[in-house]
A protein has these predicted regions:
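Alpha-helical scaffold segments that mediate packing/assembly in large oligomeric complexes
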Residues: 132, 139-235
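Short amphipathic alpha-helical patches
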Residues: 92-93, 98, 179-187, 365
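Transmembrane alpha-helix/helix-exit interface in multi-pass inner-membrane proteins
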Residues: 170, 254, 265-267
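Sequence/fold signature of self-assembling virion shell proteins
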Residues: 2-48, 54-67, 191-217, 223-226, ...
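Assembly/oligomerization interface modules of large self-assembling protein complexes
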Residues: 52-136, 156-157, 189, 193
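Short, basic/hydrophobic alpha-helical segments
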Residues: 237-248
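Oxyanion-binding "anion nests"
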Residues: 248-254
Length: 366
């Protein structure tokens, strides 16, 4: 960490450090530092736009006191909980080796012993596809924030966070890969790759439970419209109990959206009355601080569909990236009044063992 730089206790991200006793940095210096922060390369080996090797910008006049911090956004912490693995081939097979059935048996009669298969191999094909994560910073923004010593670190943290959030967006909503992609038609980046949920739909239909309904309730919790299940808990519990074999049930979680948890929890929270403080405390501690879904720990994540729940262990989900495929080009583009960073990765979303999870899909809330 640079001298004088501080870290936020809540976000762990770099916090702004004001320059003191010196004139704000020249634009060219800021561009150099931003490029180095975003690309990890010294600006001397970056290919800038033609004629922009030495850009003469006047120093920015002193501005009113400003402070910068990383804007509030969704968390991409989910990526730290799953496998993010480098691979050497752009496509191939991922093989999971597991144990077969029981091996123990008794044969004391001198008959031929018949060994059982002690290991099973489950291959799944993967293909890493290129996805672009291009971004730019306008010259106006660079002008406005040259007086912040750690503006490059803040910019890098924001870009890194957005890139990881886009990976979640594709992982939970991606249905196909199309070049070029169409952000207007597919705002949730459905055409930027096949995500984890779609992998279940395409490759493990027997592990997809689809089209079931949950009863509708009024604010008092009374059923006003009957469904296949009285609660979302009952649907999820019955789903994973029937679809996932016992040997895969040890560390399951229910991945869902925040709206799904809200639908479950609101009737209980709404029923709490002021003259029942113990009940209010119980609801807060058990339900809100330690949410569950279908008797499993609930893991709400950004961009997850409101009509689905993925039950799996987190180590069953992977994001593969192709070694040596990351390409980054930083260009100062004065003709567009911006500093652009062009970046691409080759990635693939993988479910290691379909039998170790299930997708409850197309849930209908009555």
């Amino acid at each position: 960490m640079a001298e004088g730089e501080t870290m936020s206790k809540t976000t762990g991200m770099p916090q702004p450090v004001m320059l003191t006793g010196e004139k704000p940095r020249a634009m060219a210096t800021v561009i150099t530092r931003v490029v180095e922060a975003l690309t990890g390369e010294k600006s001397g080996i970056i290919n800038f736009a033609s004629g922009a090797v030495s850009v003469n910008y006047s120093d920015v006049s002193p501005s009113p006191v400003q402070a910068g911090a990383l804007a509030a956004n969704y968390s991409a912490e989910f990526l730290n909980r799953i496998n993010v693995l480098p691979v050497k081939a752009i496509e191939g097979e991922s093989v999971m080796v597991g144990s077969g059935g029981p091996l123990a048996y008794v044969n004391n009669r001198g008959e031929r012993r018949n060994p059982q298969a002690g290991a099973t191999m489950t291959p799944h094909r993967y293909q890493c596809r290129k996805v672009n994560f291009d971004t730019f910073i306008s010259h106006d923004d660079l002008d406005a924030w040259t007086h912040l010593e750690n503006y490059p670190e803040l910019a890098k943290a924001a870009v890194d966070q957005r890139r990881n959030l886009d990976r979640l967006l594709i992982g939970f909503n991606g249905t196909h890969y199309s070049s070029p992609s169409d952000p207007e038609t597919y705002p949730e980046r459905q055409d930027c790759g096949v995500g984890w949920l779609e992998k279940y739909r395409q490759e493990a239909r027997k592990k997809v439970i689809s089209g079931l309904s949950v009863a509708g309730r009024d604010e008092g919790g009374k059923i006003v419209s009957y469904g296949d299940y009285g609660t979302i808990d009952a649907l999820v519990l019955d789903g994973w109990q029937s679809a996932i074999a016992p040997q895969y049930r040890m560390d399951l979680v229910a991945v869902c959206s925040l709206n799904t948890l809200y639908r479950k929890e609101y009737p209980y929270v709404n029923a709490v009355v002021p003259n029942q403080p113990n009940m209010e405390l119980l609801v807060n501690q058990i339900m809100l601080n330690n949410p569950t879904l279908g008797n499993l720990p609930a893991m709400p994540v950004p961009f997850f569909p409101d009509n689905a729940v993925l039950v799996t262990s987190l180590r069953n989900l992977s994001l593969y990236w192709l070694e040596g495929s990351t390409r980054t080009l930083a260009k100062d583009e004065p003709e567009y009044n911006r500093l652009s960073v062009y970046e691409s990765w080759n990635e693939a979303y993988m479910v290691e063992r379909y039998e170790a999870g299930c997708l409850i899909d197309a849930i209908f809330w009555r």
